[in-house]
Amino acid sequence: MGDKGTRVFKKASPNGKLTVYLGKRDFVDHIDLVDPVDGVVLVDPEYLKERRVYVTLTCAFRYGREDLDVLGLTFRKDLFVANVQSFPPAPEDKKPLTRLQERLIKKLGEHACPFTFEIPPNLPCSVTLQPGPEDTGKACGVDYEVKAFCAENLEEKIHKRNSVRLVIRKVQYAPERPGPQPTAETTRQFLMSDKPLHLEASLDKEIYYHGEPISVNVHVTNNTNKTVKKIKISVRQYADICLFNTAQYKCPVAMEEADDNVAPSSTFCKVYTLTPFLANNREKRGLALDGKLKHEDTNLASSTLLREGANREILGIIVSYKVKVKLVVSRGGLLGDLASSDVAVELPFTLMHPKPKEEPPHREVPESETPVDTNLIELDTNDDDIVFEDFARQRLKGMKDDKDEEDDGTGSPHLNNR
């Protein structure tokens, strides 16, 4: 075929009897609605016999290690489960075919069974909590899984060899309209000083993209008789774990400590630049990351955009960011300044990916720069312009092969250990 095509991801069951086809692996949350999960499952009719084809979509919050499961208690909570009987189609599950499903059924034949899921917009985005250096197995966090299998009923126990499991992601992109420019100020009156110290800080904008430097403008008016010895700037990630009770964890992801002095009765103004990178935070256990799929690297978790009136109990992990500016003031005076000598302000901001440009119906198929398995991409040989690509993400250079993502692992970070 030519060098243009529509990419479709596929994954087959270990026994080779079922294959699921999806048009994408990332599904965008537009706040008021989420991209539908539409695809087809191709079934070997001799294997199907008199059974039915089921597809399930599960959103789960894994918050502990499987090896800690005792007495039937599991460290996992299913936030959302939906089931579709793909074949024979149940009347309540029958929906109009999407353009992708029409093309796939035309190409794959009559044994391709369509399925469609609607993800509620109030569900959390895919977030992974970074494991520690010694941790193995599945990481804690929120993930979405599509599972297809043949059975006489939904309650039938299915072996992994006879099913297809695909981990997909629910993602959000930065809004087109940024919020107001973050600014904050505070005034501190010190003992034995007639006049106060004033700190004002601002960011150059409200939305930053991953990998983009953050400019922090700091202005200090020191009318006291004390000296500002240091100025500490930090970017902090806050993760609200919404499970049984809401707990908040904070972690610095970029820091600068400047020995900039502000003498008594003087002013100071300077712009500091910090860039939060995951590469500089690889050892921080429990740091929130964007949901990670097999063979693909990720980044710091994006800020969570919430709908008004959203139920926080099913939001899983809510991520936010703040820049903290802290002045370290020299202690002095007869009483040694019993009150705290630090003066600080916080500046909330949004850290996200920009919304990608809409892809045209036909697109160039790029040559991969990273090594892939020889069977990773299969090109069809007829006139249709569909490119089938294995669902597994391309392997990163230097990354060892993982076990299949469905394997039960041990050693994930436990929330209580953060």
Swiss-Prot record:
This is Beta-arrestin-1. Keywords: Cell membrane, Cell projection, Coated pit, Cytoplasm, Cytoplasmic vesicle, Membrane, Nucleus, Phosphoprotein, Protein transport, Signal transduction inhibitor, Transcription, Transcription regulation, Transport, Ubl conjugation. 1D-myo-inositol hexakisphosphate binds at K250, M255, K324, K326. SMART domains: Arrestin_C (SM01017). It comes from Mus musculus (Mouse). The [DE]-X(1,2)-F-X-X-[FL]-X-X-X-R motif mediates interaction the AP-2 complex subunit AP2B1. Binding to phosphorylated GPCRs induces a conformationanl change that exposes the motif to the surface. Residues 355-366 have a biased composition (Basic and acidic residues). Residues 1-163 are annotated as: Interaction with SRC. It is found in: Cytoplasm; Nucleus; Cell membrane; Membrane, Clathrin-coated pit.
